[in-house]
């Protein structure tokens, strides 16, 4: 009986030192940012920490060790992180990382930081004292480790079930899906910084993953189908291409009603082509570079590759929401295609999946989509993308300063004709019944390159879907036009035109 009471007392004493024991209140942290000029922030100072009421706050520091020279990267406040609990000193324990990271609790605890890797040494054997141990000592030495271990396991299990881990994966049993391509993402500090865009299915954040910026597209749980569709497209063999958005990971965060679905991709600071054209006028060479790399990306997406770089068969994929908002720009203005939430794959012997007719952005819908007269075959969907490409090429031309003449403010296709928020009926009237297209300005046609590009645009948005050019042909055309205008002749060029209305156009090429 006395042994049972002793065990109970030990357990109670251990439980009394629960998770709140040793917690230090964190209100302010030392702040430092090595990239302060680029990010337009303060370089150093004190940061006041703010967070949710029931969450703990910490300080952190990150630095590099370049051959013994310490290079401080960042300091500041850190969100609720189990790895930082009850740490009064900022100590990094990883053996030899690229970037050292530590976190702690308590005001200004990150003022000093150190690296102390875990060392596994020989086991220390406790030698009992020479006198014969009493029954009490035997019970304490036997039961105390068991009690501590049991409480630690229970505590860890309770915290796993009742808190939303800030940097870990959360699994949903009914749809485990394929494993994420980058399992280390959940082990690295990922911090959301600012919202960059809001779209049909959620918002896009700029985030920091260690020293790199990434984009995090967050879907609410009710848009799970769109998240799954885009994840499946990204996981298709052969989707790694310089003109397709780089995929990093797909994750599920939170539990129950707080569940969020994340897609983590490369971040491009220049944003979308729409945003760039709103604020910038482009040169002839810049126009050619954006247009050629954009066509190259769509051509590769449309291509069926039997054996792609050892990854397997890459099927033809139709984008189905091609527009300037879904074309991102790298720092050198190389185009990158993004947003594959509505994309559909065409695999031999398999149905293409969800192929509802009227999907995408109304303004960029082809005539056959607006009419609801779609042939649900692969070629028909690829030609729909090509109509939209014609509109995006027109947007590029409208902001080019290649010739003398005014460069108008940026406008969306058909904005001049039917405004910024056209209805489906407005577009049916203009595009289908009147067969109108965005207008070419007279002074554009005085430039030999722009004049040829206008011919190519007309062949992209042709009312007859079967007469539209393929993306691969557009890529070749633009390369030839650029060489011609820049002084390199080519026998394969389409004829230079001086007017779109009174010229014999070259034979129109099918999109296949």
Swiss-Prot record:
It catalyses: L-threonyl-[receptor-protein] + ATP = O-phospho-L-threonyl-[receptor-protein] + ADP + H(+); L-seryl-[receptor-protein] + ATP = O-phospho-L-seryl-[receptor-protein] + ADP + H(+). The lineage of its organism: Eukaryota, Metazoa, Chordata, Craniata, Vertebrata. Residues 190-478 form the Protein kinase domain. GO terms for molecular function: activin binding; activin receptor activity; ATP binding; metal ion binding. Residues 159-512 are cytoplasmic. It is an enzyme of class 2 (transferase). It is a single-pass type I membrane protein. It comes from Gallus gallus (Chicken). ATP binds at residues 196-204, 217. On ligand binding, forms a receptor complex consisting of two type II and two type I transmembrane serine/threonine kinases. Type II receptors phosphorylate and activate type I receptors which autophosphorylate, then bind and activate SMAD transcriptional regulators. Receptor for activin A, activin B and inhibin A. May modulate neuropeptide expression in dorsal root ganglia (DRG) neurons and ovarian follicle development. Induction: By activin. The active site is at 321 (proton acceptor). This is Activin receptor type-2B. Belongs to the protein kinase superfamily. TKL Ser/Thr protein kinase family. TGFB receptor subfamily. The gene is ACVR2B. Gene3D superfamilies: CD59 (2.10.60.10), Phosphorylase Kinase, domain 1 (3.30.200.20), Transferase(Phosphotransferase) domain 1 (1.10.510.10). Not expressed in hen anterior pituitary during the ovulatory cycle but expressed in the ovarian follicle. It is found in: Membrane. InterPro entries: Activin_recp, Kinase-like_dom_sf, Prot_kinase_dom, Ser/Thr_kinase_AS, Snake_toxin-like_sf, TGFB_receptor. One of its GO terms (biological process) is pattern specification process. Pfam families: Activin_recp, Pkinase. Its EC number is 2.7.11.30. Residues 25-137 are extracellular. Residues 1-24 form the signal peptide. It comes from the Eukaryota. The chain crosses the membrane at residues 138-158. Keywords: ATP-binding, Disulfide bond, Glycoprotein, Kinase, Magnesium, Manganese, Membrane, Metal-binding, Nucleotide-binding, Receptor, Serine/threonine-protein kinase, Signal, Transferase, Transmembrane, Transmembrane helix. Its cofactor is Mg(2+); Mn(2+). Disulfide bonds join 29-59, 49-77, 84-103, 90-102, 104-109.
């Amino acid at each position: 009986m006395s042994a049972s009471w002793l065990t109970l007392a030990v357990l109670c004493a251990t439980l009394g030192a629960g998770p709140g024991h040793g917690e230090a209140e964190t209100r302010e942290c030392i702040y430092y940012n090595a990239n302060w000029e680029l990010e337009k922030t303060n370089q150093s100072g004190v940061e006041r920490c703010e967070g949710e009421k029931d969450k703990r706050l910490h300080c952190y520091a990150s630095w590099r060790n370049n051959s013994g020279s310490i290079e401080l990267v960042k300091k500041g406040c850190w969100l609720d992180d189990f790895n930082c609990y009850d740490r009064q000193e900022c100590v990094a324990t990883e053996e030899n990382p690229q970037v050292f990271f530590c976190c702690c609790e308590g005001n200004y605890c990150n003022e000093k930081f150190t690296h102390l890797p875990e060392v596994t040494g020989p086991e220390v054997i406790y030698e009992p004292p020479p006198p014969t141990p009493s029954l009490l000592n035997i019970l304490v030495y036997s039961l105390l480790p068991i009690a501590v271990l049991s409480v630690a396991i229970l505590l860890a299990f309770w915290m796993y079930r009742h808190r939303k881990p800030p940097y870990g994966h959360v699994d949903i049993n009914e749809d485990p899906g394929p494993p994420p391509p980058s399992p280390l993402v959940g082990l690295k500090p990922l911090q959301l910084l600012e919202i960059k865009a809001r779209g049909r299915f959620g918002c896009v954040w700029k985030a920091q993953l260690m020293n790199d910026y990434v984009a995090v597209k967050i879907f609410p749980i009710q848009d799970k189908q769109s998240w799954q569709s885009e994840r499946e497209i990204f996981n298709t063999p052969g989707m790694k291409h310089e003109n397709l958005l780089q995929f990093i990971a797909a994750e599920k965060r939170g539990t129950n009603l707080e569940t969020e679905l994340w897609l983590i991709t490369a971040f491009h600071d220049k944003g979308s082509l729409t945003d760039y054209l709103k604020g910038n006028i482009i040169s002839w060479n810049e126009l050619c570079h954006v247009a050629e790399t954009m066509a190259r990306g769509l051509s590769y997406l449309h291509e069926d590759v039997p054996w792609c770089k050892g990854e397997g068969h890459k099927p033809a994929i139709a984008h189905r929401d091609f527009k300037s908002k879904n074309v991102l720009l790298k720092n050198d203005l190389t185009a990158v295609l993004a947003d594959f939430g509505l994309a559909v794959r065409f695999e031999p012997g398999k149905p293409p999946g969800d192929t509802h007719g009227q999907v995408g952005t109304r303004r960029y819908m082809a005539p056959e989509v607006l009419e609801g007269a779609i042939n649900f075959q692969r070629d028909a969907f690829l030609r729909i993308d090509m109509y939209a490409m014609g509109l995006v090429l027109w947007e590029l031309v409208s902001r080019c300063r290649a010739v003398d003449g005014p460069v108008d403010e940026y406008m969306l296709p058909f904005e001049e004709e039917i405004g910024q928020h056209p209805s489906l009926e407005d577009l049916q009237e203009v595009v289908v019944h009147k067969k109108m297209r965005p207008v070419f300005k007279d002074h554009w046609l005085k430039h030999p390159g722009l004049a040829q590009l206008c011919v190519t645009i007309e062949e992209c948005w042709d009312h007859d879907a079967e007469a539209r050019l393929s993306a691969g042909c557009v890529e070749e055309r633009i390369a030839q036009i650029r060489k011609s205008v820049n002084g390199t002749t080519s026998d394969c060029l389409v004829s230079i035109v001086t007017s779109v209305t009174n010229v014999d156009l070259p034979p129109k090429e099918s999109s296949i």
